[in-house]
UniProtKB/Swiss-Prot annotation:
GO terms for biological process: endocytosis; intracellular iron ion homeostasis; iron ion transmembrane transport. The lineage of its organism: Eukaryota, Fungi, Dikarya, Ascomycota, Saccharomycotina. Belongs to the oxidase-dependent Fe transporter (OFeT) (TC 9.A.10.1) family. PANTHER family: IRON TRANSPORTER FTH1. The chain crosses the membrane at residues 12-32, 136-156, 171-191, 290-310, 359-379. High affinity iron transporter probably involved in transport of intravacuolar stores of iron. Keywords: Ion transport, Iron, Iron transport, Membrane, Phosphoprotein, Transmembrane, Transmembrane helix, Transport, Vacuole. It comes from Saccharomyces cerevisiae (strain ATCC 204508 / S288c) (Baker's yeast). This is Iron transporter FTH1. Residues 46-66 have a biased composition (Polar residues). It holds the Pfam family FTR1. Residues 33-135, 192-289, 380-465 are cytoplasmic. Present with 486 molecules/cell in log phase SD medium. GO terms for molecular function: ferrous iron transmembrane transporter activity; iron ion transmembrane transporter activity.
């Protein structure tokens, strides 16, 4: 059997396109949750007994560090993080107020340190729970779309074959045009990755810091909505299901003229490549090399989209020519005269047929190559690039000014309000997190005793803090 019986480049690239979008979204969710909770992703999930971020079972360490902070010299008094080092230094005698402070507030100081450790432990547990929800949502969505898609393709192949052959090029043309539009939008998705990361970060952080949310499963709040408690499961589940079903529809449409045996290998290889890219994106999401890779991948995707757009128009024109020939597809007979509409032809060569000539099928599947170009296919190819360039230019202007000049504001009102809401939510999130940090870590140098209004810690110049 031929190689085309086991592998289809069309199915491979279609499924790769959709699966890449899925893994990128899931990777963004994981990255933002990890950064939002400020936890390390290595130790807590390797099964080691000493997980990073968990509190030490020795509770005396907190008391020792607190005492060491009060015993530290003036040069170390403003650095809380160096209290453990200061404990090893030569101690100085405590004055009366400091002794009163340690005696009267030792339990409170230990409770503050214990609460800080418990907060860190809760973050680790919360991250573990959210990570499981995100991965499980993506996995269940992928499984469900494969089950639905498998049944859809099987029924479509066995029942709709005869109906397909009557208007084959219409179906292929329309689906190619739709696929081109989807790829073009996904290219903007890659180019605007930084903005999308901020958008996802605001949305997900608003869920994390929601007062009504209960992602750790506290039984005292029984009124938590299902959509709030499992929001990190629902988002990747719906995304994976939607994108997966889109891939199945395109595979069932564009690849309908190919054998069923070519689907499994194409889908498995596309999934493997997407998984590798997702892991790479998750680990190196902020590196310069990844940004370069995204730009290169976007350029490659736009080449594919331009080819699909041109091929879609070419398919529609070919079907019109087939209808004029009483339903006989002359392009399947051969490459010579009579196999194409000479009234619409721009060029035609009697070889390099992308429909059946081996390696040229790769260029057809990727770049939309055809050995018989028409006026519509050539104009549509150039028009695609002109529209894309104008769209990117307008988006750059919008990024710079916040709106598009010389365009009625009423047409842009929805986008402007959306951008303002995201910016406001981002500022509120930063303000909220700063309040949390300030409330959980009040400087000890500002604490005052009952008997005096003078701060306990005096700087080296002798002035009170």
């Amino acid at each position: 059997m031929a190689f085309e019986d086991y592998f289809s480049f069309q199915i491979f690239f279609i499924f790769l396109r959709e699966s890449l979008e899925i893994v990128v979204i899931v990777s963004i969710l994981l990255t933002i949750v990890k950064q939002g909770l400020s936890v390390e992703d290595d130790s807590p999930f390797e099964g080691s007994s000493s997980s990073a971020g968990l509190p030490s079972p020795n509770t005396n360490t907190n008391a020792d560090s607190t005492t060491a902070f009060l015993q530290a010299g003036p040069s170390d008094g403003n650095a809380i993080g160096t209290s453990a080092t200061a404990a090893n230094n030569k101690s100085r005698p405590l004055n009366v107020e400091e002794e009163e402070e340690i005696y009267e507030y030792s339990n409170e100081l230990r409770d503050q340190d214990r609460e800080s450790d418990e907060h860190t432990a809760d973050n680790v547990k919360l991250y573990q729970k959210l990570k499981i929800q995100i991965l499980a949502g993506g996995a269940f969505g992928l499984l469900l779309c494969m089950l639905i898609g498998g049944a859809f393709v099987s029924i479509f192949y066995h029942i709709g074959t005869d109906l397909w052959t009557l208007s084959e090029h219409y179906y292929e043309g329309v689906l190619s045009l739709v696929a081109s539009v989807i790829i073009s939008v996904m290219g903007l998705f890659f180019l605007r990755m930084g903005k999308l990361r901020e958008k996802f970060r605001v949305k997900l952080a608003s869920i994390i810091y929601s007062k009504d949310n209960n992602l750790l499963g506290n039984k005292t709040q029984k009124g938590v909505k299902f959509s709030e408690k499992y929001s990190f499961f629902i988002l990747p589940f719906i995304t994976t299901l939607r994108e997966g079903l889109e891939a199945v529809v395109f595979i069932g449409g564009i690849g309908i003229d190919q054998p069923l045996s070519s689907i499994p290998l194409s889908m498995v290889l596309a999934t493997a490549i997407s998984t590798v890219f997702g892991i790479f994106f998750f680990r190196y999401s902020s590196s310069l090399s990844l940004k370069i890779c995204l730009v290169v991948a976007t350029c490659f995707l736009y080449l594919i989209a331009a080819g699909l757009f041109s091929k879609g128009v070419w398919q529609l024109e070919l079907q019109d020519y087939v209808n004029k020939c009483n339903g006989q597809d002359m392009s399947e007979v051969g490459n010579g005269p009579g196999s194409y509409d000479i009234s619409r032809s721009v060029w035609h060569v009697n070889c390099c047929n992308g429909e059946k000539d081996g390696g040229w099928m790769i260029f057809t599947a990727i770049f939309g190559w055809t050995n018989s170009a028409t006026v519509g296919s050539v104009i549509s190819y150039n028009a695609y690039w002109l529209v894309l360039i104008c769209a990117l230019k307008l988006l750059m202007i919008e990024e710079k000014y916040g709106y598009i000049p010389y365009l009625p504001i009423s047409w842009q009102k929805k986008r402007i309000m959306k951008r303002l809401s995201i910016a406001k939510a981002s500022l509120d999130l930063k303000h909220h997190t700063s309040e949390l940090n300030s409330s959980t870590s009040e400087p000890d140098s500002q604490r005052r005793s009952k008997d005096s209004s003078v701060p306990l810690i005096i700087d080296s110049s002798g002035s009170a803090n």
